[in-house]
Amino acid sequence: MLSNFCDNGLTDKNTIHSYLPVYEMLFAPKRLTATDILEIGIGPIPHQNGGSIRMWHSYFNNADIHACDIIHINDVHRCIVDVPRIHLYTSTDAYTYALTVNTFLMKNIQFDIVLDDGPHTLPSMVAFINLYLPLLKYDGILAIEDVQDITWINDLRAVTPDELKPFIEVYDRRSVKGRYDDIIFVINKYKRSLHLAV
């Protein structure tokens, strides 16, 4: 279970939010086969962050875990610094074309999962889809968490390529813990790959 690897003191994904059951369902089929996972957002609180990065590292034990954040490396919890298979890109704006090209595209890195837990603004979420959807494997999963307003789903759907619109999933968890932003937007290319295989 994903919750077995979650340190609630270092991530809010299982405390004020209720994301772990969704991620367990989405990511379990990829647990042993995933090779590259990306999360934008290590955490804003100095030295009380990195919990989700460590959780992915333990859960996907055959994958390299990539994490981007604008915070300085000195503010990152030591539990994920200089750890094999964890690649940190700090003091970095992840929402730029230059970063995606120079850091990932030119190195032929494609992701099984890309997860946006960044500034939680609509422009950053739109940029995330535009920049990182092309870096997904044919059966990859894109997830944006902490969608601040349910009406933003329409905007995120609008920038999703038409051929992937049938594989959009929205997980509205607001009623679970009373969090206004407990919403995850997903483009599930893994489901598309299963559909094409039939």
What do the PLM-derived regions correspond to, one by one?
Residues 1-115, 119-144, 148-198:
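A short alpha-helical cap/connector motif
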